[in-house]
Amino acid sequence: MSITEEIRKQAIKNAYLHDGRADVKSVVSKLMAEFPEARKNPGDLINDVKKCVDEINSMGKDRIIEIINNEYPEFKIKEKKEEKHELPELPNAKNGVVMRMAPSPSGPLHIGHSRMAILNDEYVKRYGGDLILRIEDTNPGNIDIDAYDMIPEDLKWLDVNVTKTVIQTSRMDLYYREAKKLIENGYMYIAETDQKRFKELKLKSMALPDRSMDPGVHLDRFDKMLNREYREGEAVAVLKTDLNHPNPSIRDWIAFRISYKRHPLTGDEYCVYPMMNFSVAIDDHYLGLTHVIRGMDHLVNTEKQKYIFNYNNWKLPYYYHYGIIKIPGSVLKTSIIKNGIKSGKYTGWDDVRLGTIRALRKRGYRPETFRRYWINSGMKETGATFSWEIFDSINRQLIDRDAMRFFFVNDPVLLDLNNDIDLESHARYHPDIDLGYRKYIIKSHSRIYLSRRDLDDIKPDEIFRLKDLCVVKRTEDGIAYIDDDSNKRLKIIQWCPENSHEFTVQKPDGTVDSGMLEPLAYNYNGVSQFERYGYVNIINRNGYFLHR
């Protein structure tokens, strides 16, 4: 078998194994490893592989599978039954569950939040019951008023079915009532001390003098807190736990604090706010939570919250904690995003450089991609790193059959096409599905756009193919038409006619590609594949890079 035939064979195999897209580096590495003669002229080998890969990647998956079946059956992969990923069963769930999502309204949801939302939603859909959206807004200094609307919008787009919405600041009277009950029963006290001394004593497993005072004193102090008779930091409500607990953070922990910051939703109505662990425990009981699913970072919080359940003789929900997922290459922290929006660095919460649900939606990810990824990840307790490669692969499977194909020429160069006859281009909108053709008439002696990068790779007098148009040769003053022979095995590159439109593609790394987009794509809206470039979401004549 000649090296040319071997290149084609390995490129076909590589494309077959990788969703219809061969990779030049992988094919070259394979050839050099298995065929010593291929190492003699690596430059020529790389160019030959590029030509072959361009041709194969333009075929479409169905055609590649056909070639494998007819020419290289030894490469066929035995079809396996698609592995069905399912979440584990929950105990005592057959009669329905009550579960919750509890985001803070500091901003919209990001990709990490989608895990919590989807796992809870999957179980409620499996067993029936209620999925509660509880907006935890008891920290007045960290609230974005728009988040009260953005969070439900994000969940709706993710196809998460919320059956009830609860806002914690509408339940303050409940928190105050439960606090007074705990004080009366000797489980909570009001500490009139500064934070530094409080922490120092906790680390030594020592009690504040306030701890042993009569509950009546603490009820009076709590009323003074509510009546604004303390300054911020002068008094806090503390839940009694075990001062000898091995984890200092679980020893007597603060349950209420004073804040005179104006709340974006309730204004100045309240000045005493429950800390997260207090309000969560109260709500989980009164909302009837049966099962709680959240990250391993909440393990300590769960231990803290159990004290309130035990003091009140309340039935505990079932707790599940999944491992922490590190999400690389994505901006998620709300404070960083807010500051970036204020400074003009980011255009908004949907800036494609961010990891918010809105940004990923804008780029063109499908809601089902999030669901499949998190179900596949399951509820393992071990930590892991989020795989954008797997996430993109899932999304590619969902979008590919609907994605129209178009030509986009990045960093374009306008060249004379020396053709004595009119040429006609018939390019399929999709290689595997009959969606029709994009038709262009290229008049004699027209001009077309090629990418500067492609042009730099073409040697003088080199013959190559303009995809779905004709065979041409590089000349000193442009390119010259040779023929329409579609059977020649040549390097294939995309092009755009002279009447194409200027177009930009914003990328998640912050760069912007500027080029020309073929006329029939200019008014298109939705995810499309720019051939030899990648998938792009077009929104009102603006392009947002999705993935390759």
UniProtKB/Swiss-Prot annotation:
Q: Which EC number applies?
A: 6.1.1.17
Q: What Gene Ontology biological process does one annotation of this record name?
A: glutamyl-tRNA aminoacylation
Which SUPFAM superfamilies does the UniProt record give?
Nucleotidylyl transferase (SSF52374), Ribosomal protein L25-like (SSF50715)
- Give TM segment ranges: none
Q: Where is the protein found, in the record's own terms?
A: Cytoplasm
Record keywords: Cytoplasm included? Answer: yes
Q: Which InterPro entries match?
A: aa-tRNA-synth_I_CS, Gln/Glu-tRNA_Ligase, Glu-tRNA-synth_arc/euk, Glu/Gln-tRNA-synth, Glu/Gln-tRNA-synth_Ib_cat-dom, Glu/Gln-tRNA-synth_Ib_codon-bd, Rbsml_bL25/Gln-tRNA_synth_N, Ribosomal_bL25/Gln-tRNA_synth
Chain's role: Catalyzes the attachment of glutamate to tRNA(Glu) in a two-step reaction: glutamate is first activated by ATP to form Glu-AMP and then transferred to the acceptor end of tRNA(Glu).
Q: Of which family is this protein a member?
A: Belongs to the class-I aminoacyl-tRNA synthetase family. Glutamate--tRNA ligase type 2 subfamily.
Instruction: Kindly provide the name given to this protein in its UniProt entry.
Output: Glutamate--tRNA ligase
Organism in which the protein naturally occurs: Picrophilus torridus (strain ATCC 700027 / DSM 9790 / JCM 10055 / NBRC 100828 / KAW 2/3)
Gene behind this chain?
A: gltX
